[in-house]
């Protein structure tokens, strides 16, 4: 802003001062009082038209500065890229609509899958039921035969066991009793025979003796009777006594009769066998007939109707998505273009100030060339041509000690900021910035993709909903058929089982009753009845009760129940795919793609294409930036080698030492005191700005030239150009010390003493101003009291 204000002030002063030409070595330049600046853009009066561009001409071209041009190139690249993106979006829209129609067809086919699958499922279910029923009947037939034989075996085993026990117990007991009775009878008969024989002998003898006695005694004669006495005849009684016999057969007749009447239970077994076999045989006959004739009819299962989905035809979500996507891209394009255009316009403002400042610097350097107060013409031209990088190099070089290191530091900055190097860097940065803008557009595009994915998810939900409805309807009808089949089998097949088990239980009850009846007939009224009934209950009754209990359990559990179909039998996989984390399992996805589905893939391909372009341009731009850093690295290596290497002497082929200032006696006699010296010391030696600042009683702090000091800078006119400003500060009474040539002392500047003559002071002052590009301060004892001249930075 100071430079711009100085330029405006110079325009005003231009009209208040008439131009005057000097015929001296400074011909063509005006002399102005201290502090007055000419219009630095005005050409000399005798050279109004110049072959070079003035400030106004330079300012007229600020709108085509490098940064504005780069931003315009970026705008053009973005316009081309966005035009390509819009074309890709249009193609993606067409592809997405086509894919949506395809997905709609796929969804209709998926929703119609129950129609096609149900026929096969119905046939498979019917075949399964037929095989299951036939297998169950065959198993039932074999089970009936096995149960029949087992029941008969158990009954035979129980009756035979019971028969054997009864025969063993009762027959054995009766035979023992009969044998004992017969033995007792024989013993008694023998004893009676002996007793009766003895008695009959004794009676016979008594009879004979008695009759003899009576015959010898004539009792009638005694009593006057002629009757002979009677005789005693006991033979008949003796015979009767001898005939006494005990018949054992009459004693064990009842036991023999009981022994002969023991039951063999053959009738019971035959009766039971006939009763038990009858239901079994009837059931087996029915099972055989059913096995041959049974076949489940699959036509009783329902068949769902075909479905036709129209979620794309009746829905404008995809159209709305792409319209919104184009609007979003247009909005992003407008925002980016507005920002870039504003940045391109605003870039002209600092470039205008840059031209003003560069023009002033060029005027200063031109003044130095005019006065020939320089030692390095190339350095002066470089500073005039590249004022910014040269000034940056000057500031950087002050951090190094030694004239060679400072020159190498400036050379490194000049090498790194050369026009070709900066051109490569600018291209790389512009490319990266373009990639950034395109990346913003890409993220905007990717941000909209979830909305389309949600719409596609709704499409899938439509398909799954249709599948669920068809599957549930079919499952209800199929389950009704299965339930009817269960009822029919339970009533017709297992009804026979229930009848059979009931008949067997009834038969066992009849068997028990017949056994009890036979035992009552045989042992009723005898002492063996209760033991026999106890044995019967132990051996037969408990086992029959167990068989009846088992048959009752069979009757209670003899039923079949085929599993029913789940309502989501046809939609389970499709519904599960919606919640699956892997995209390849989505039933709407193409197996050859890795995106969620074909519809979103149409938009994703646009993003991938733009991403590939951004990646390619980013690699190219990064390569350009890398090339620039390679250039910088080459310069840095050269500088490091130069700083670390030893300087060659003149005898070794090195360069001659550079003088501190020009030999004015040889090269330019009587020309070492240009206009600037008169401005510095005045025409009489005591009215210049140097004397003004060096007089005692001046300002407590004096501002030194070349800008950047503690306060406002003094102006030093150079043939109409604005003067540089002071940087360091010293008091007017301080004396400057002498600094040996070639020494570097930080960044304060070279200080010289008043041992030199005035002409040497003037020439040295101009020399150091001309060689100010060295950017270092020479000297050791920089400040001392006494009179001195203003310091100069080189």
Swiss-Prot record:
Compositional bias segments (type: Polar residues): 11-27
Glycosylation site residues: 21, 189, 259, 270, 288, 469, 483, 498, 505, 520, 580
Membrane topology: Multi-pass membrane protein
Keywords: Cell membrane, Conjugation, Glycoprotein, Membrane, Transmembrane, Transmembrane helix
Residues in the Extracellular compartment per record: 1-66, 171-332, 443-622
GO annotation terms (biological process): plasma membrane fusion involved in cytogamy
Signal peptide stretch: none
Basic and acidic residues biased stretches: 756-768
Residue numbers spanned by region Disordered: 9-30, 756-794
InterPro entries (UniProt xref): PRM1
Residue ranges annotated as Cytoplasmic topological domain: 88-149, 354-421, 644-794
Subcellular compartments: Cell membrane
One GO cellular component, as annotated: mating projection tip
Top-level division of the source organism's lineage: Eukaryota
Main localization (coarse): membrane
Transmembrane segments: 67-87, 150-170, 333-353, 422-442, 623-643
Family note: Belongs to the PRM1 family.
Function recorded in the entry: Involved in cell fusion during mating by stabilizing the plasma membrane fusion event.
Name recorded for this polypeptide: Plasma membrane fusion protein prm1
Originating species: Botryotinia fuckeliana (strain B05.10) (Noble rot fungus)
Protein's gene: prm1
